[in-house]
Swiss-Prot record:
Ranges for domain FBD: 364-416
Pfam families xref list: F-box (PF00646), FBD (PF08387), LRR_At5g56370 (PF24758)
Keywords of this entry: Leucine-rich repeat, Repeat
SUPFAM superfamilies linked: F-box domain (SSF81383), RNI-like (SSF52047)
Species of origin: Arabidopsis thaliana (Mouse-ear cress)
Native organism taxonomy: Eukaryota, Viridiplantae, Streptophyta, Embryophyta, Tracheophyta
Name the record gives this protein: F-box/FBD/LRR-repeat protein At5g22660
Length: 450
């Protein structure tokens, strides 16, 4: 008889045989509402949920704020002599009396809480937070969503390492800048902004400790329309190793002191509604400054929208050199592929290239310069071309270009929308007819998976 069979017949409860501290750790990984339901299992489990140092609660699950406060106070009272690890509170209903909730949040913060998340799901429900939040010596991470942040007399968050500020309102222009600068060991910052009259148009991020920065503005989700040139982003973070910019509103991006090992994910449009706006020197100047600020990057992922603007910029201005760049993942509109050699020429040490092709050629065929970029002759080892839609052969012309001109190429991969195995086989056979500059190159064709 197997041991498992014996256990099943004896009805042994392995979970309940664990010590309390392990059970508490298991319960802390559940939403509090689920953890509380375990109290009906037995006398031992009745109050076990109160020993979990995490409160993850949705106020909407309670009949009213008074019921919630009664429940939450009971929970906090169980931590009078110990630290609360995490408080995650969310709500949506407008009936919530925040002036009842705020003192309770203050009480929780005084228990030397390490992680705090306040998530309002209706517009700017929380008009203020207790001052203890901004003076906490214990907070390690802070996430605020739809919160009104007023002018701070004093802010000090000496141990805060992670901060996510999402769709909040800042009553004064310097509020966010002061907030960020008051976190001397901040490593991870996310800022999601709205496009409205209340949002400060110039965002300045200055930090000597920041490692990861994500900035987001999506004007398509906002009712307010502002085509002014006042929206700007200024970044000075010399320790930054990851930068994500998803911004279709800001006109200008000034990036200072980016380190040589940094990686970036870029999707910006400089608030350009018409590509011909780049005929103006002011618009081109903003693009040029942005590219110069990114020129020390090691690894970049760039959107088709941003690359289209850069390609038009290159018809008028030279591209700065990205000498540290070893990996580039780019979405390229096929109508802009004639500028690809120019982009590659600016990356003389590129080792890995991923191109995802978008759009269709209308009447003309793609024309690539006969001049071979330096990286193809000396450093480019891996190339992947992705063609999600069945095109008119641009991916094959591009494949031929790389196979015939890349001297040290080791791996070439074509990911294409093939309707059948037979069509996939035809693509392989055509690729094998192309002359290969690198005899060591391995060719791989895979079907694009939707």
């Amino acid at each position: 008889m197997s041991n498992q069979g014996a256990i099943r017949r004896s009805g042994e409860d392995r979970i309940s045989s664990l010590p309390d501290h392990l059970l508490s750790q298991i319960l802390s990984n559940l939403p509090t509402e689920n953890a509380v339901t375990t109290s009906i299992l037995s006398t031992r489990w009745k109050d076990l949920w109160l020993s979990t140092p995490v409160l993850d609660i949705d106020i909407d699950a309670f009949d009213d704020a008074t019921t919630f406060i009664s429940f939450a106070t009971r929970f906090l009272d169980s931590f009078k002599d110990s630290c609360l690890h995490k408080l995650q509170i969310s709500f949506q209903m407008e009936a919530v009396d925040m002036w009842t909730i705020i003192p309770w949040i203050e009480d929780a913060v005084k228990r030397r809480i390490q992680h705090l998340e306040v998530d309002s799901r209706i517009d700017h429900m929380i008009d203020t937070l207790p001052l203890t939040v901004y003076l906490s010596e214990s907070l390690v991470s802070l996430r605020l969503h739809l919160v009104m942040l007023h002018r701070f007399v004093f802010v000090s968050l000496p141990n805060l390492k992670v901060m996510h500020l999402e769709e909040n309102i800042y009553s004064y222009a310097e509020t966010m800048e002061k907030f960020i600068s008051s976190c001397p060991v901040l490593e991870d910052l996310t800022v999601v902004r709205n496009v409205d009259e209340a949002t400060e148009k110039v965002l300045r991020v200055s930090s000597q400790s920041l490692n990861s920065l994500k900035l987001v503005i999506d004007s398509s989700k906002c009712w307010y329309n502002d085509d002014s040139d006042d929206w700007k982003v200024v970044i000075d973070a010399p320790q930054l190793v990851y930068l994500s910019l998803k911004d279709d509103q800001s006109v200008s991006f000034v990036i200072n002191n980016l380190c040589s090992s940094a990686k970036a994910d870029i999707k910006v449009s400089f608030n350009v509604s018409d590509i011909w706006d780049l005929e103006e020197s002011f618009e081109r100047s903003n693009v040029g400054k942005f590219l110069t600020g990114l020129s020390s990057l090691r690894d970049m992922t760039i959107s088709g929208t941003t690359l289209k603007i850069i390609c038009h910029y290159l018809k008028h201005e030279p591209m700065p050199q990205f000498r540290n760049m070893t990996r580039l993942h780019a979405k390229f509109y096929v109508c802009d592929l004639e500028m690809l050699p120019c982009v590659l020429e600016s990356c003389p040490n590129l080792k890995s290239l991923v191109l995802k092709l978008k759009g269709e050629m209308e009447n003309e065929e793609i024309s690539l310069s006969s001049s071979v970029p330096k990286c193809l002759q000396s450093s480019l080892e891996n190339v992947e071309i992705i063609r999600p839609n069945y095109g008119s052969g641009e991916e094959m012309k591009l494949s031929k270009y790389f196979l015939e001109n890349s001297l040290v190429l080791k791996k070439f991969k074509l990911c294409r929308d093939c309707h059948s195995e037979e069509q996939e086989s035809l693509v392989v056979r055509e690729l094998m007819t192309f002359q290969r500059c690198s005899s060591a190159c391995e060719i791989n064709v895979v079907r694009f998976q939707r």
